[in-house]
């Protein structure tokens, strides 16, 4: 459980949705994180020149949704509202085509990784897997997943994921 108090967004409410790239950037400030980069403590990660390009790329995912909602948003069956396509569960081949077009456009705009694809893919996988587990075992994972998804959609959060390579050399130390 996170012991830190939740930071209010620029709208002044902790649960207010992030509406733009500027809102996203502001939501990252003043979190009191202990960040070290190349052995040096970073006082405010948002302003660090090595970190900032990644932040700007994520911010563009919000701004594209504002500028081009047909491309970068979709109507959620869980909230009934338009949500960022990175938080949308693909329900048709058309959804997958639009995901690809959005990702292509973001690549053109940012020229870099925009940090949200793995989270989107994880959400889509979890949607299917939790339903299958519930069907086989009578558990409540899918409902809890849908509740979390709807909360993330309402607040327009970034959901991140990580890829690892299990075949990477393990004989070397991390240090």
Which positions does each model-derived feature cover?
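Glycine-rich flavin
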Residues: 74-175
